[in-house]
Amino acid sequence: MLRRTALLALGLALALPSVAAAATIQFNPPITCMQQGKSYPLGGSGFTPEYAMRVTWEGASASFYPDSSGALPGNESSEITAPEYDSLTPKTLAITATDSNPATTATLSIPIVKFGSNLPVEGKPSKVVTWMFAGFVNNAPIYGHYLYGRKEKKTVRFGSGQGPCGTLTKRAVRFPIKRPKNFGTWEIRIDSNPKWVRSSESLAETSFTVAKPRRG
């Protein structure tokens, strides 16, 4: 009797459909924030093997084919591009991946922001203004290099990026040199280097004019 019961239980277990693992999506390599307009490889698992799946995000979509194990490769063949977003204040982007054989859905929410700075250098040099920065992830330091004739004249440390998108808002003077000896066109370069490196890429940069003060 016990043997018959055990065999019956085994038969029922074999007859039940297996429960598929929940589908998931993630960026490969992992990121904490998307830069507007930049492409990122999307990986995933738990989808119908070799069956078309669709990924949608803020008015855009793309179709991919998972491999024989139901996984997305997370390389150039499964990239998605962040939408244009002209703001230094992050917003949340929702990404949804679905297939219909059987219906499978995975979602991912991630902040998106414009990397850079508002660069408020136009106006009275001595005025204290609001500086905004974004894209300095992992608490990266934020430096502003003031250049004249392509030579570094002053470097200011504004602080460090905060949160998943490496943002910072700080009140600081427009132009940190009280009595400049050079007038005309200056440049400012924003990056994470304590000293300006000519070959380094800036996260934000612009030129501005420092006028010679009038006498009398």
Segments the model singles out, each with a brief description of its role:
Residues 14, 21-216:
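Extracytoplasmic/secretory-pathway segments with low complexity and glycosylation-like composition
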